[in-house]
């Protein structure tokens, strides 16, 4: 018979550090910390959270199951997680001027799935921005649930300027009569005309969903128009430019949709919410309500414009000619380069970004003709216009070197840039 002593947790269970309990994972985390400290992070969907967010997400809230919503749980002992979730809800509503907020989505994909579950039936028609023009997988890609379970029709950008043609969107909506129109994307650098999108949706009897996952932090900071007054439903991730933990958020000012949206998340898609993540969301929303976040959002946009201009000054083409938000797409075709090769070269030089398709891209998704660059993470660590101008120059040096790879100088250039990146990042330390 097993004794109580041997059946219980080991003596070190509540006291051992991660180094002691699992040195392999501890080493991986230390390696990732070193990477983040000494690389320039330009992936537009990534950011650097505060120590307070890290602490909340690594808290004892992870132990608690809390199916349901505050005040209506299926488990006892939820009094403190109710406090955390109510704070997250109230702060999200205040931050975005919304009457309703659901803070439980585990991810951006699940928040959008929930809206589809609440508003559509399988086989219904909806419209979204084409992935190749800067949209997102969950906006109707044929490899995604949204494109498999529903009839997706895509609007796109004009070939001549790579900007959405709203008259074409109107005409397409009138022709196909979608039940839902999605505005938002993952690689579109220009402002969205939410008022016009709502007018188009109303004219054909459609719901308007705005997925502001990429630019929500700019909305919160007052440097980007808010979709909340126009959309029937607004969704966003809580990381990216909002600088919180990875997760999702659903907002609405339409009281008639609140119950449907709540039911779509639970019990429709999810069971017990991740209460440690919700606590961290509350912390991040609180941070975004402070005056300094407005300064941050302003700097993100200024830095993006500076980086775009720096790239142009070094002879690179920027899709649509520039940016109105936190990201840009670099068209590599004039340099004879591919996105996958360019991404790897920059990673070797300690500059992290991602290959990305550009509008009407002739290359396959794992090759691409473009790079996506974003400024939220490096802005968080303190980079300003001067630093992003330097970064633009370093990117150009690396890419020009691999474009002339036959001279054998590319590895030397990459190594030299890596040293310059370390000197730059050492001036802006994180998590000391």
From Swiss-Prot:
GO cellular component: cytoplasm; cytosol
Intracellular or extracellular location(s): Cytoplasm
Top EC category: transferase
Disulfide bonds: none
E.C. number: 2.1.2.1
Cofactor: pyridoxal 5'-phosphate
Keyword Transferase attached: yes
Protein name: Serine hydroxymethyltransferase
């Amino acid at each position: 018979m097993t004794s109580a002593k041997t059946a219980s947790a080991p003596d070190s269970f509540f006291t051992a550090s991660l180094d002691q309990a699992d040195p392999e994972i501890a080493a991986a985390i230390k390696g990732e910390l070193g990477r983040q400290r000494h690389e320039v992070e330009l992936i537009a969907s990534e950011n650097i959270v505060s120590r307070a967010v890290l602490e909340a997400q690594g808290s004892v809230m992870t132990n608690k199951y809390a199916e349901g919503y505050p005040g209506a749980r299926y488990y006892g002992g939820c009094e403190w997680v109710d406090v955390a979730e109510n704070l997250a809800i109230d702060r999200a509503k205040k931050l975005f001027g919304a009457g309703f907020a659901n803070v439980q989505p585990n991810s951006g994909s699940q928040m959008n799935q929930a809206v589809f579950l609440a508003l559509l039936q399988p086989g219904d028609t909806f419209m979204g921005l084409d992935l190749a023009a800067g949209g997102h997988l969950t906006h109707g890609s044929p490899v995604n649930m949204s494109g498999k379970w529903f009839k997706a029709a895509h609007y796109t950008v004009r070939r001549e300027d790579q900007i959405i043609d709203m008259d074409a969107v109107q005409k397409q909506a009138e022709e196909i009569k979608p039940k839902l129109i999605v505005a938002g994307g993952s690689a579109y650098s220009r402002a969205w005309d939410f008022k016009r999108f709502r007018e188009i949706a109303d004219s054909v009897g459609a719901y308007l969903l705005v997925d502001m996952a990429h630019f929500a932090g700019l909305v919160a900071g007052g440097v980007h128009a808010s979709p909340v007054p126009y959309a029937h439903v607004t969704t966003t991730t809580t990381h990216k430019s909002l600088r919180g933990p990875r997760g999702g958020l659903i907002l609405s000012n339409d009281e008639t949709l609140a119950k449907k949206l709540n039911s779509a998340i639970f019990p429709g898609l999810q069971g017990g919410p991740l209460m440690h993540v919700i606590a961290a969301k509350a912390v991040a929303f609180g941070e975004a309500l402070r005056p300094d976040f407005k300064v941050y959002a302003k700097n993100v946009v200024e830095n993006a414009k500076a980086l775009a201009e720096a790239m142009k000054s070094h002879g690179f083409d920027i899709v649509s000619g520039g940016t109105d938000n936190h990201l840009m797409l670099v068209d590599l075709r004039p340099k004879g380069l591919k996105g996958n090769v360019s991404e790897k070269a920059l990673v070797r030089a300690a500059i992290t970004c991602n290959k990305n398709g550009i509008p009407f891209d002739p290359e396959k998704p794992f090759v691409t003709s473009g790079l996506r660059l974003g400024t939220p993470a490096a802005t968080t660590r303190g980079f300003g216009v001067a630093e992003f101008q330097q970064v633009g120059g370093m990117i150009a040096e690396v890419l020009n070197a691999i474009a002339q790879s036959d001279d054998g100088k590319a590895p030397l250039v990459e190594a030299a840039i890596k040293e310059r990146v370390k000197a730059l990042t050492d001036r802006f330390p994180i998590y000391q």
